[in-house]
Amino acid sequence: AIPSVNELLTEWPVVKAAGETCDAVVHAAVTAELDEERAAIRAGAAPRSKRDLASAIEWRAHRSALPSLRPAVNATGVVIHTNLGRAPLAESAAKAVAEVARGYSTLEYSVDTCSRGSRKEHAAQLIRSLTGAEDALVVNNNAAAVLLVLATHAAGKEVIVSRGELVEIGGSFRIPDVMAASGAKLVEVGATNRTHLADYEQAITPDTAMILKVHPSNYRIEGFHEEVGSRELAALAHKHGLLFYEDQGSGALLPDDILVRGGEETTPASVSAGLDLVSCS
């Protein structure tokens, strides 16, 4: 007969596992192991002894209690790999994080005024210095930034985007879906491979809130192709009293020869070009 849950909970390996993890983890391990045991017996396998079941439960409990986030070896050939944590922290940066995280900190306290401060200011002041922007805000990722920008500045209003920039990025980030979630109204202009300045201007109505330019990220259109640059779109938006917002995708804070050869703009360059809003990750 299959041992009961109570019987297994008194076995030493299970008792030991409960002391090293917690009761909830052990109870879940017992339930899962018994479910597997019943399925195996129905399939014709011989029943395991109580001791074997207890050892299996101990192993399962310890395994389920392990952190799911752990170091990995990146052998993919992709240096900045989204699924593997993107850019590793420098040793000095990791040390600085650990130094602050192991105790109390001035997260939301201003030493200058001896009063409550702003938790966003720590990163914001650094980003302002790096980019020349008037202000900055750090959120979870660029997808969150896009949603927040659209919901804040264009909910219930129209946002003009080129058809060739209605991209889908890994993790099911799709521009039309994010637009719908924000409450903004998507206005597609141009063709998939060619969009002209006149296409944007002709789409402007009294309900237009902004013009959006989206970086295509890991795909490109080649051959018979044309797109409008950010500076031209910013000038058009300002001519009509609209906001111009550039979703840079990954973005880059510092210039790099490879980026320059690829025709990529850095975030500081976009800010200095007069763009109203820029987001990147």
Regions found by a protein language model. Name each.
Residues 43-89, 93-97:
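Long amphipathic N-terminal alpha/beta scaffold segment
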Residues 30-31, 35, 75-76, 86-112:
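Glycine-rich phosphate-binding segment of PLP-dependent enzymes
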